[in-house]
């Protein structure tokens, strides 16, 4: 018996789960309890956080277009993901996926994190570019672990205030 089931038609799977690939859910994990986190992420969505993944992330833009806002060597950059593009993001490159197109779909593959290996989530000041807030978590479930972290940041003006210039990060409305 195959642990993860028989092969299946992936485009059909995406169509069958399309209702989960848009707000408010936005993503669906393909397999549970494997060594890989294989997720399909849909649009539209807009994120204000930057993810610091301790391991590589693989992106395959299946439908539509998206882009990653990046912090590289202290400056902002952008990596466009056009339909059909693949991209391997190195570990610890801060990235903020932006999926402006409804109906878009991206396959994202990550490795499960070993115990003690933490993911970071950061927010930067729009006015001066300094780090406003960082939180680290032992990531077990994207669906259950992340919303409380984000809500805690959005709900606190103190957490959103830039320690360098005093500007308040607008939170989810950025």
Curated annotation (Swiss-Prot):
Changing residue 110 to A: Decreases KM for 3-hydroxyanthranilate 2-fold. Decreases activity 2000-fold. It comes from the Bacteria. Inhibited by 4-chloro-3-hydroxyanthranilate. Mechanism of inactivation involves the oxidation of the catalytic active site Fe(2+) to the catalytically inactive Fe(3+) oxidation state, superoxide production, and formation of two disulfide bonds between Cys-125 and Cys-128, and Cys-162 and Cys-165. Enzyme can be reactivated under reducing conditions. O2 binds at residue 47. Binds 2 Fe(2+) ions per subunit. Keywords: Dioxygenase, Iron, Metal-binding, Oxidoreductase, Plasmid, Pyridine nucleotide biosynthesis. Pathway: Cofactor biosynthesis; NAD(+) biosynthesis; quinolinate from L-kynurenine: step 3/3. It catalyses: 3-hydroxyanthranilate + O2 = (2Z,4Z)-2-amino-3-carboxymuconate 6-semialdehyde. Substrate binds at residues 57, 99, 110. Transmembrane segments: none annotated. Gene3D superfamilies: Jelly Rolls. Fe cation 1 binds at residues 51, 57, 95. Fe cation 2 binds at residues 125, 128, 162, 165. InterPro entries: 3hydroanth_dOase, RmlC-like_jellyroll, RmlC_Cupin_sf. CDD domains: cupin_HAO (cd06123). Its cofactor is Fe(2+). GO terms for biological process: anthranilate metabolic process; L-tryptophan catabolic process; NAD biosynthetic process; quinolinate biosynthetic process. Its EC number is 1.13.11.6. Homodimer. Belongs to the 3-HAO family. Catalyzes the oxidative ring opening of 3-hydroxyanthranilate to 2-amino-3-carboxymuconate semialdehyde, which spontaneously cyclizes to quinolinate. This is 3-hydroxyanthranilate 3,4-dioxygenase. It comes from Cupriavidus metallidurans (strain ATCC 43123 / DSM 2839 / NBRC 102507 / CH34) (Ralstonia metallidurans).
């Amino acid at each position: 018996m195959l642990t993860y089931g028989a092969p299946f038609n992936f485009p059909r799977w995406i169509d069958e789960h399309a209702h989960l690939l848009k707000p408010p859910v936005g993503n669906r994990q393909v397999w549970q309890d494997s060594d890989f986190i294989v997720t399909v992420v849909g649009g539209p969505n807009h994120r204000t956080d930057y993810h610091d993944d301790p391991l590589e992330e693989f992106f395959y833009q299946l439908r539509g277009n998206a882009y990653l806002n990046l912090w590289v060597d202290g400056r902002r950059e952008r990596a466009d993901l056009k339909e059909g593009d693949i991209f391997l993001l190195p570990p610890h490159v801060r990235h903020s996926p932006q999926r402006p197109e409804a109906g878009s779909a991206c396959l994202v593959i990550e490795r499960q994190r070993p115990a003690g290996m933490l993911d970071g989530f950061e927010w930067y000041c729009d006015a001066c570019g300094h780090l406003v807030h960082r939180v680290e978590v032992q990531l077990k479930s994207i669906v259950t672990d992340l919303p409380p972290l984000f809500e805690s940041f959005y709900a606190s003006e103190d957490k959103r205030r830039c320690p360098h210039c005093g500007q308040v990060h607008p939170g989810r409305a950025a």
